Amino acid sequence: MKKGYFLQTCDTCNRILKEVNTNGFELQEIKSNPVNAQQLEEMHQLSGSYEDLFNKRARLYKSMDLKSKNISEAAYRQYILEEYTFLKRPVFIVENEIFIGNSKSVVEALKLKIG
């Protein structure tokens, strides 16, 4: 199984999509087709945490002043399901491994995994 979740208007996502070999991937644009509860649960099982999947750089995170709040795992889950920008991106699932975000180390690990 190879899946990728990205935001089409995100320049970083587009750069990474061009950088890695996405042949054979099922790609999902999260603004036009937001992740559902089942997909998020699959990501959670692989990552071990909703917080790891949560984008703390989202504008809404700042405007809602979420940094000052003590957010539970259940709340992180709900925020991601309600607002696509709260999903850290891109997210790639390759077999039973998950690659979250755009750090160089994550992108390099993804490239090594898919060859």
PLM regions: where:
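Local sequence-structure signature of Cys/Sec-based thiol-disulfide redox active-site neighborhoods
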Residues: 1-30
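Thiol/selenol-based redox catalytic cores and closely related redox-interacting motifs
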Residues: 33-110, 114-115
